[in-house]
Amino acid sequence: MIKETLPGLYSWSEYSEEKKLDFNGLLIIGKDESIIIDPPDLGENDELELKDIIDSHSSCPLKAVLLTNVHHERASGLLKDKFSVPVWVNKLDKEALEASTDKTFIGGDTLFCGIQAIQLEHQKSPGETAFYLKDQQIMILGDALIGKVPGEVSMLPPDKYKDPAKAKVCLNKLLEYDFETLLVGDGTSILKGAKEAVKTFLTN
């Protein structure tokens, strides 16, 4: 089921039995364009519903599928073909993708819908990127932080990093930005008070 989590922001999930978490995807309808982020697999009904939502916002055409990291490739190839849009990923993750990517970005770039790309160093993959929507005070993360417990954030298991301590320190970069909402690729997102939750985790 696809739901409107926030005005102009739709989400859907696929439950991972292995991880015991929801894998989350996003559709963002901007002022004059739309994007999909980290799409997990969709059932047939969800696929039709996603198409209906996109078609109903024809004045904001879908421009791209954006990936926060190489491991969130997921259903991007399917949606690339279905909607004839390019897949974008951080330049540092391009070579590791299973399928060929169309476009790359780097930290500091401004992408579709006004999204700011924030490079996060020393994470699970070299191209881990946060997507920031300044006007809406929304931060979007892939594997940098996950939501295992509602209202809280945590990192992936230590064996996913070359240096877990350094990876955690580098996440302090997120606190340089003002955000109320944190949308995570894995687990439960935080719609209010998200920056405080991130700060609490990083300072413990």
What are these regions (language model features)?
Residues 1-33, 52, 175, 196-199:
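Zn-dependent metallo-beta-lactamase
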Residues 9-12, 34-38, 87-89, 115-118, ...:
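Short hydrophobic-aromatic micro-motifs
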Residues 33-43, 60, 122-203:
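Metallo-beta-lactamase
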Residues 47, 73, 114, 125-126, ...:
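Structural motif corresponding to alpha-helix initiation and N-cap regions
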